[in-house]
Curated annotation (Swiss-Prot):
Reported function: Component of the large ribosomal subunit. The ribosome is a large ribonucleoprotein complex responsible for the synthesis of proteins in the cell.
InterPro entries reported in the protein's UniProt record: Ribosomal_eL18, Ribosomal_eL18/eL18-A/B/_CS, Ribosomal_uL15/eL18, Ribosomal_uL15/eL18_sf
Intracellular or extracellular location(s): Cytoplasm, Cytosol; Cytoplasm; Rough endoplasmic reticulum
GO annotation (BP), single: cytoplasmic translation
Species: Bos taurus
Annotated crosslink Glycyl lysine isopeptide (Lys-Gly) (interchain with G-Cter in SUMO2) location: K119, K164
Stretch list, region Disordered: 150-188
Segments of skewed composition (Basic residues): 161-171, 178-188
Keyword terms of this UniProt record: Cytoplasm, Endoplasmic reticulum, Isopeptide bond, Phosphoprotein, Ribonucleoprotein, Ribosomal protein, Ubl conjugation
Xref: PANTHER family: 60S RIBOSOMAL PROTEIN L18 (PTHR10934), LARGE RIBOSOMAL SUBUNIT PROTEIN EL18 (PTHR10934:SF2)
Protein's UniProt name: Large ribosomal subunit protein eL18
Molecular function terms from GO: RNA binding; structural constituent of ribosome
Gene Ontology annotations for the cellular component aspect, listed alphabetically: cytosolic large ribosomal subunit; rough endoplasmic reticulum
Pfam families, sorted: Ribosomal_L18 (PF17135)
Amino acid sequence: MGVDIRHNKDRKVRRKEPKSQDIYLRLLVKLYRFLARRTNSTFNQVVLKRLFMSRTNRPPLSLSRMIRKMKLPGREGKTAVVVGTITDDVRVQEVPKLKVCALRVSSRARSRILKAGGKILTFDQLALDSPKGCGTVLLSGPRKGREVYRHFGKAPGTPHSHTKPYVRSKGRKFERARGRRASRGYKN
């Protein structure tokens, strides 16, 4: 008897469809699957891939970040495309005229964009508007903005580590002595 082949690493782990059963998302997937196949544009392939992603991999994009990214040279008059949610940012005083396409736009962000004379498209409208993604800028929110990422990395307590430890309380007696002050062993 020979040693059999290990089949545990055969499967390529990647999404081929969204996990969600949302019928409207599924319709968009149908549309962009067609466009990705029939057009030779990478834009449609990227949008399709992002439609499959989980919520944590489609972080919300704030209005301020979008304005900042759209102010960069060569992006005037282009459509900002976000496969995710656009949220409002109260720190922004004036909103420029923007043309935006997103899966969702929060109510306050929506009213502010429209008030500034901007335009909000859905992805099916974008497919009619620019089927190859011409004149668009693909944007996404900060994926590592979630608090949980602060706990990842080098173990807390090791030299040069800025990783946040999981502590039940932030009091004086919790992870504040050895390794945090020179009088208690060492400080790093």
